[in-house]
A protein has these predicted regions:
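Active-site activation/catalytic loop segments of kinase-like enzymes and analogous catalytic loops
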Residues: 241-280, 295-311
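Conserved NTP-binding catalytic cores of kinases and kinase-like/nucleotidyltransferase enzymes
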Residues: 1-91, 98, 224-226, 340-348
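All-alpha amphipathic helical-bundle segments outside canonical DNA-binding/catalytic cores
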Residues: 137, 141, 282-294
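ATP-binding pocket architecture of kinase catalytic cores
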Residues: 43-156
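ATP/Mg2+ or Mg2+-diphosphate-binding catalytic cores
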Residues: 301-348
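Active-site catalytic-loop/activation-segment of kinase and kinase-like phosphoryl-transfer enzymes
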Residues: 2, 161-201
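Active-site acidic catalytic loop and adjacent metal/ATP-binding pocket
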Residues: 34-45, 49-50, 83, 196-242, ...
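Short Pro/Gly-enriched beta-strand edge/turn motifs at strand-loop
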Residues: 18-25, 193-204
């Protein structure tokens, strides 16, 4: 997790939120990610969120692109936590420091929704006694929102042409080779092979464009039955099936210790895909690419978890290790069949 820099005193934080007319007495730390610090605060009667990106992590121009995309989505009916301009008229502010370098500050409004991971339907409210297992409206809405974003990508352009690209596969493979023990060198090779296959996929406006890049439950709210999106830090140019596959992978991992893993996995995928299909069609070629992306994400997860020691990393590593082979049991699902599936949940 990101470490708060020594220069970020209460006074310095006051000066930063002051760019958005923030009230110092209302500031609350909201946590951190690998490269960001998050703070909530009030300004002119609204709750807002400051995202402070640490020096060297993102080019400010790329952050400008990120939030141009967020604004574009909002202008076209997608619920996304919208940025606010500073009193200088800027969407993105650069905070210079003579020793630690420049940090990048962005402020968005705070969602009024409920985090998806805390909603009644997530894993798996619809299966509670007295509910209709056919419904799963949040899963369908999740898929529908994904498809709507992908449809909108075709019409989006930024002043710089959106320069942020997908992960650097060769660099990740080299990292895996460096950090894993020699006995696990096949893992790095699997990562390289998956990336090489991914790079051979077609690139056109029907399959490739700006994607969220981390469209998982952890980055979504439920707001009056609609999906509201935040954390666009991983948005980039990529394949739309990448977005779909990361959603599926993260949910499969969340289900990995459930008694009826397969039944609930199929339930989720079929409902998510049902929602996606209501807005945008996928052909069999792209559905057949889902297992490739799942293997890629799984290998990445294994490498990342091998560098951590907390209990959550242990769960991730266990799931990833069990599915490193080409015959990964967790991914042995009929994605084409689930895409067109209309039936109910058969689990108990």
């Amino acid at each position: 997790m990101a470490t708060r820099p020594s220069w970020l005193s209460p006074e310095a934080l006051h000066n930063i939120i002051g760019l958005w007319h923030g009230e110092s007495a209302t500031v609350q730390p909201l946590g951190s990610s690998t490269n960001h610090l998050l703070f909530g605060f009030s300004a002119t009667g609204r709750r807002l969120v400051l995202r402070l990106s640490l020096a060297g992590y993102r080019d400010p121009a790329h952050v400008e692109e990120e939030f141009a995309w967020v604004r574009y989505l909002g202008e076209n009916g997608i619920l996304a936590c919208q940025p606010l301009q500073s009193r200088n008229g800027c969407w993105v502010e650069t905070i210079d420091h003579p020793v630690d370098g420049a940090c990048v500050a962005v402020v968005t409004r705070e969602s009024r929704g409920v985090p998806l991971v805390l909603s009644d339907e997530y894993l798996f409210g619809p299966l509670a006694p007295g509910t209709n297992p056919q419904d799963a409206p949040v899963f369908r809405e999740w898929g529908r929102t994904s498809a709507r974003m992908h449809k909108l990508a075709a019409g989006f352009s930024s002043a710089t042409g959106f320069q942020r690209n997908l992960l650097d596969g060769p660099a990740l493979s080299d990292l895996a080779a460096r950090v894993l023990p020699a006995a696990e060198s096949p893992v790095a090779e699997t990562l390289r092979q998956c990336w090489d296959e991914i790079q051979r996929l077609p690139v056109d406006s029907e399959s490739y464009g700006v994607i969220h890049g981390d469209f998982t439950a952890a980055n979504l709210f439920v707001n009056d039955g609609q999906i509201e999106i935040f954390d666009f830090d991983n948005c980039c140019q990529g394949w739309f099936i990448y977005d779909i596959s990361i959603t599926i992978y993260a949910t499969l991992m969340a289900l990995s210790q459930r008694a009826d893993y397969r039944g609930e996995a199929e339930f989720f995928i079929s409902r998510f895909m049902n929602g996606y299909r209501s807005e945008r069609q996928l052909d069999a070629f792209w559905l057949s690419a889902v297992p490739l992306f799942l293997r890629f994400f799984n290998t990445l997860a294994y490498v990342a978890a091998s560098q951590q020691s907390d209990s959550e990393a242990g769960v991730v590593r266990s799931f990833a290790a069990a599915n490193l082979g080409a015959d990964a049991p967790a991914f042995d699902l009929n994605f084409s069949g689930l895409y067109s599936f209309h039936g109910g949940y058969d689990g108990t």
